[in-house]
Each structure stands twice: as C-alpha cells, then as structure tokens.
Amino acid sequence: MKKRLYYLAFGLVAIAASSCSKLDNYPAPSNTITGSTVDAGTGNTVQTEIGSRGTRVKLLETSYSSNPTPYYFQSMQDGTFNDTKIFAATYNVSVEGPFVPLVQTDSTGKVTSDQSQNITIKGTNTVTKLNFKVEPFLRIDWVGQPVFNADSTVTVQFKITRGTTNANYQQDVTNINLYVSNTKYDGDNNYDPRYTNMISYNGTDGTSLIGQTITMTTTGGALPQQDVYFRIGARINAGLDEYNYSTPVSVKYP
C-alpha cells in the first residue's frame, strides 16, 4: 500500500512539473503597437509628461470577453507611444490624456461618441502603427527664445490658446507653471523647485490670459552654471486635471 501511495505521489509531482514546464515555455509576447497622439488642429504631437499622469494608451482585449479588464501603457513625453510586448489578439485601442475624450458617454453610460480603433494582431514580431487625432484642452506655444537676465535668472514668453471648441471643455485655467530642470524631461512630476515658477489661479484670472503673450521669470535667484531646460505646463479643471505642455527648450549658460 505504501509503495502504491509513493508511486501515486511521484506521478502527481511529475505531472505538475510537466505542466509548469509547459507554462514556462509559453512564448513571451513579441508584437509591437506604436504610434502618436496628434493635435487634430495643428498636426503636431500632443506633448505630455512621463509617468502615470501623462497620456496613456488603453487596450481592451476583445478576443474572449465583451467586458475585458483594461491594459494601459504610458506615452512618451513627445506624444509618441511604443509597446513591444503585445500578445496576438483582437483589441479596442484608445488614448486618454489632457484632451477631449475619444470615447464619450452620456449620464446613463450610453456611448455618444467613439473614435477608438479596433485592431487584430496575428502571429509574432509584428508592428501595428496607430495615430489618434485629438483636440487638446490647451495649446502652448513659445514666443521667441528664453532670455538670460543680468542677475542670471531667465525670462520666457509664450501663448496659451484653446485647443477645442467643445462646449464641455471650456473650463477655467487653474494653473500655469514654468518648469526648470537639468534634463529635457521636465514637467509637473520632474522639476527643480528652487527655480520653477508655479502660479495657481482663481475664477477667470487664468482664463483671461488665453491668447495673450505671457511673460514668466524663474524664481530662486541665479540659475546654476549648466545647461538648463524650460517647459510650460497649464491645465483646466477638466478630465483628470492633467497638464498640457509646451515643447521643452534649453538655453546655455552665458
């Protein structure tokens, strides 16, 4: 009897080991989804920040479920995205960020507008390219180049305009920030607090600056003697309160 139990236990262990081996040998995902989030009005990519508060790509695998759990991956700062570890399957794909949502619903949850894209990925090592045209809440454009002042602070000029005429996304501007960093990856999650100039607005105070040339100067005295990057971020009280951004610019210490 003991021998039989021994052989039975040994057999179960062998089966389990075999099953684990098969699972371990399952091929890793090797397909790529790449592309851009593009401003429908200008054709430029929509600037964002790196990390969880930036633009993200949303995938719904619809191959086996009508109500799948979303899978997200983050966009890069310049508005492009790339994920090289995607399984072969059928997906519904959209992007989420500081722009009019591609998928909109009414108060009952009924979809009223859907600009997401459906794709089918087959095989391995394939590349699927997707571009999404969106209407950013705000556009931020530099006016001229940053200027070094006599006291080694820097003054910049820029304009903020609306990126959409959608009546649901005309909220007041709540924040306008001049970010300073020693890398080009500056934003609300990566800046030097000694020199960054951050302004919060109440009511229509920030909104009244839309369309005007805005001037801001770094804080904290003389900048360090090194290459410095500047970037403007602004946001309205909508969506996930994410920032719209200018492109980063650098200036060499004189």
Language-model features: where?
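Short beta-strand elements
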Residues: V111-I119, L240-P254
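Short, ordered, surface-exposed loop/turn motifs in non-cytosolic proteins
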Residues: T42-S66, Q170-V173
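Beta-strand-rich modules
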Residues: T217-D241
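Short, acidic Ser/Thr/Gly-rich low-complexity loop/linker segments typical of extracellular
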Residues: T62-T80
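Short amphipathic, basic-aromatic surface patches that mediate peripheral association
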Residues: T37-V46, K159-N168
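Short Pro-Gly-centered beta-turn/loop motif in secreted/extracellular proteins
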Residues: N82-F99
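Structured interaction patches on ligand/partner-binding surfaces of diverse proteins
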Residues: P98-N131
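Bacterial Sec-dependent N-terminal signal peptides
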Residues: M1-N44, P254
